[in-house]
Amino acid sequence: MANVSFLFVVGIAIGCCTAAHAQPVPPPVVGDISVDPKEAAPLEEVRKLIAAGRSKQALAFADEHLAKNPRNAQMRFMRGVILSDMNDNDRARAAFQQLTEDFPELPEPYNNLAVLYAADGQLERARAALELALLARPDYATAHENMGDVYLQMAADAYQRASTLQPTNRAVSNKLALTREMVTKARTPR
């Protein structure tokens, strides 16, 4: 993903199991779609507005641009990221879902959809979205990392259930402690 100028990873599952843990980061340019030179300036304007913390203005600009250019996948992706940054997760989820339907070959919308699912505790849906991201691009390192985070959270949940059922099982207690430690370390901003 050499042409990605920014990376949007909110720390799937363990880094954003609640909205309070979400760490909004400027969005990437969708890697598999080349930028039409006339589209570069509007994308850069949105990036600048996002970087300046002016999400509402960035959203308005993106919406205005998309009214004239509804198939612009990069601007649509950025719109989803802006909505996510604004904690408008229902609309962000809808934006990323529509992108996956219109551009199933792009892994980034699946990844961001997975981030939102994980933030809501929907780990199975997050896992499924990440599988589709990896199907679209098997070498997408961010999706692999996020898949590991989802599996780690799933493991912690399973060990917690096992510990509740068998509170004296030392092996389960040790595994639960290890996964909790890993979850805590993974939440540390990088």
Region locations from a protein language model:
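Terminal, low-structured helical/coil segments at or just beyond the last alpha-helical repeat
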Residues: 23-39, 152-190
